[in-house]
A protein has these predicted regions:
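The conserved beta1-alpha1 loop
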Residues: 110-112, 187, 212
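Active-site nucleophile loop of the alpha/beta-hydrolase fold
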Residues: 209-217, 239-243, 261
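Conserved hydrolase catalytic core segment
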Residues: 199-205
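Flexible, membrane-associating and regulatory peripheral segments of lipid-active enzymes
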Residues: 2-130, 134-139, 146-152, 156, ...
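Glycine-rich nucleophile elbow surrounding the catalytic serine of serine-hydrolase chemistry
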Residues: 185-196
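Non-catalytic cap/lid and distal C-terminal segments of serine-dependent acyl enzymes
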Residues: 156-157, 193
Length: 345
């Protein structure tokens, strides 16, 4: 109840209107009239949408006035330093002393709640890209993701995305970065950080990949406050715990639903959804390295979720570079329960 009480108390303080009573469990629709907010111990707490949105509106005022801090660090990995990152800043001295090379494509990778730049997802995705050749892989470390309170981390998403955009703009304006060579890849809350980065870049980044974009405290009906398909020239979403920790409705221009997008094989009961949620990062790293996730085109996302898209594989591979030029729609992705997870007909 900790999160609910905090939200309710703050909402009372900022609103002249009385709050509605907490909805009965039978009336709750996650993402529609409220959210189950994840807790650090893996449990979740229900918060009515009106309560949460009043609190977020008040908190946005504090964020906008600079009354909160949003520390963000950037670590560059290249084929010359594939395992030990170089911390870079938006200064010519810093970039000049690093191995950044504008002639090579650039990939930004952004972690989610409770994580840091040392998280295994960053290592896996970094290694996958560097296994393919010369890339600038920049891992974003945003400290407020490590708040024990999920809502506090959510409120840092916009400001963090703007700081990522500032780094992109600096590299473009001063060090020859070509936006057509830029991918921004984010998991969970990091997917929405990627969206805000795209919204605030001077020009359009080529691709954003949202790895199971977080659902709690984000509304499908407010695309300007979440990752959406207009945030880059091409946006791809890989949705693995839809309707729980991640969105179920399609987020990207290309929306991919491994195993139907709700739960993943090999995760067991997965009562919290954490295993399925994390599989999006594992699948993506494997897709980058092996290009082995075949997909089946669906008429709509409901068909992808129900796995009723037929059995004919398309020419589209989940996570492939070519998707930006040929993909528009929803895809069902068959997967194995163990690595290699990808399946090709």
């Amino acid at each position: 109840m900790k999160t609910f009480l905090i939200l309710a108390l703050i909402a009372v303080a900022v609103s002249a209107f009385p709050l509605k009573e907490e909805l009965e469990e039978s009336e709750r629709i996650h993402g529609e009239n409220g959210w189950y907010i994840p807790q650090e111990d893996g449990s979740s707490v229900w918060v009515n949408m009106d309560v949460a949105e009043q609190w977020m509106e008040a908190q946005e005022l504090l964020e906008g006035r600079g009354l909160t801090t949003v520390p963000v660090k950037f670590y560059l990995y290249t084929s010359s330093n594939p395992t030990k990152g170089t911390k870079i800043t938006t200064t010519t001295k810093s970039i000049g002393a690093s191995n950044f090379n504008a002639a090579h494509p650039t990939r930004f990778v952004i972690h989610g709640w409770t994580q840091s730049y040392t998280a295994s997802m960053n290592k896996d995705i970094r290694s996958a890209w560097l296994s393919r050749g010369d890339y600038n892989v920049i891992i974003v470390d945003w400290a407020r993701a490590r708040s024990v309170d999920y809502a506090t981390s959510v409120m840092a998403v916009s400001s963090t995305g703007k700081k990522v955009a500032s780094m992109i703009n600096f590299l473009k304006d001063n060090h020859g970065l070509n936006l057509n060579d830029v991918y921004v890849i984010g998991h969970s809350l990091g997917a929405h950080v990627a969206g805000y980065a795209g919204k605030n870049t001077n020009g359009q980044v080529h691709t954003i990949v949202g790895l199971d974009p977080a659902l709690p405290l984000f509304s499908y009906n407010k695309p300007n406050k979440r990752l959406n398909s207009g945030d880059a020239w091409y946006v791809e979403s890989i949705q693995t715990n839809g309707g729980n920790l991640g969105f179920l409705k399609p987020i990207g221009k290309g929306a991919f639903y491994p195993n139907g997008g709700k739960s993943q094989p090999g995760c067991g009961l997965d009562l919290t959804g954490a295993c399925s949620h994390a599989r999006s990062t594992t699948y993506y790293a494997e897709a980058v390295a092996q290009d082995n996730f075949g997909s089946i085109k669906c008429g709509d996302y409901e068909s992808a979720v129900s796995k009723e898209c037929g059995s004919t594989y398309s020419s589209v591979r989940m996570g492939a570079d070519t998707n930006a030029y040929m993909v528009d729609g929803d895809f069902y992705v068959p997967v194995n329960s163990n690595a290699p997870f990808g399946m090709i007909n």
